[in-house]
């Protein structure tokens, strides 16, 4: 699955994606939906993912803290 175009999905597609069990899994590039939402400055999607529990499911080393 390639999540790099998650910001172009329509709201109905996004709701379907958020209800799936693959929501917080990494894509073929090793990044999560939260990574792409932050990279594209899509604050609405970032907030939606955070409310859905993205912080509990962060991928190790995806967001290095330094």
Swiss-Prot record:
Sorted UniProt keywords: ANK repeat, Early protein
Top-rank lineage group of the source organism: Viruses
Expression triggers: Expressed in the early phase of the viral replicative cycle.
Renumbered ranges of ANK repeats: 29-58
Record has Ligase as a keyword: no
SUPFAM superfamilies recorded: Ankyrin repeat (SSF48403)
Keyword Transmembrane helix listed: no
Membership in a protein family: Belongs to the orthopoxvirus OPG039 family.
Other noteworthy facts: This protein is homologous to the N-terminus of poxviridae interferon antagonist K1L. Presumably a premature stop codon mutated the gene in variola.
Name of this chain's protein: Truncated interferon antagonist OPG039
Classification of source organism: Viruses, Varidnaviria, Bamfordvirae, Nucleocytoviricota, Pokkesviricetes
Gene: OPG040
């Amino acid at each position: 699955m390639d999540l790099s175009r998650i910001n172009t999905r329509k709201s109905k597609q996004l709701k379907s994606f958020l209800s799936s069990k693959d929501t917080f899994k990494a894509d073929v590039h090793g990044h999560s939906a939260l990574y792409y939402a932050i990279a594209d400055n899509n604050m609405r999607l970032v907030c939606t993912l955070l409310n859905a529990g993205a912080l509990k499911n962060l991928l190790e080393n995806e967001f290095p803290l330094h």
